[in-house]
Amino acid sequence: AMITVEGAISLDEISAPSNTADRGQLYTNADNHLHFINGAGTDVKVTEEVFIVALSDETTDLTIGNGKASFHMPFAMTLTAVKANCTTAPTGATIIVDINEAGSTILSTKLSIDASELTSSTAASAAVMSDTALANDALITFDIDQIGSSTAGKGLKVTLYGYRT
């Protein structure tokens, strides 16, 4: 089906729509962002931006170093979360990653993947963002500060979540 709109559409703010199995719903809530909830009840923030950045290939052991990946922000963005994952878990030590905007860290507690884990989601110390406002065209760089001591780890990726500002 296609909807053609001439003029404005307004949406009422609600905390969450009721789940309707046979249709999806668009709504806004207190975060002032557009959301979509599908018939199964999965809620997605439509305005969320997600960047996945590879800091290595899939088969080579990770190495410590600055500037493992970089890009310029295509627009200003407010970060809401950062995560990391790898395809081969580190052993013997934790993988630690720093994210920088224009050469300065944006993390007061760096992103980490604990030994024998594949994701930062289970890290004993969660990443803490100290700078969530990324400027348009800012240079974003990624450093690997620590790798596993027995098995370095492989296939490292960092995911940035946020919304345009």
Kindly label every feature range from the protein language model.
Residues F142-S150:
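Short beta-strand-plus-loop segments that form exposed binding edges in beta-rich domains
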Residues T20-I37, K83-A84, T141:
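Short hydrophobic/aromatic-rich beta-strand motifs
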Residues F51, G65-E101, I140-D143, K157-Y163:
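Beta-rich globular "head" domains
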Residues S15-N19, A76, M129-A133:
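Short, surface-exposed secondary-structure edge patches
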Residues T88-N136:
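Terminal beta-strand-rich extracellular "head" domains
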Residues A1-E13, N32-T63, T80, N100, ...:
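Glycine-rich, low-complexity segments
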Residues S149-K157:
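Extracellular carbohydrate recognition
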Residues T59, K68-F71, V128-T132:
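Beta-strand-rich interaction surfaces with strong enrichment in secreted/lumenal proteins
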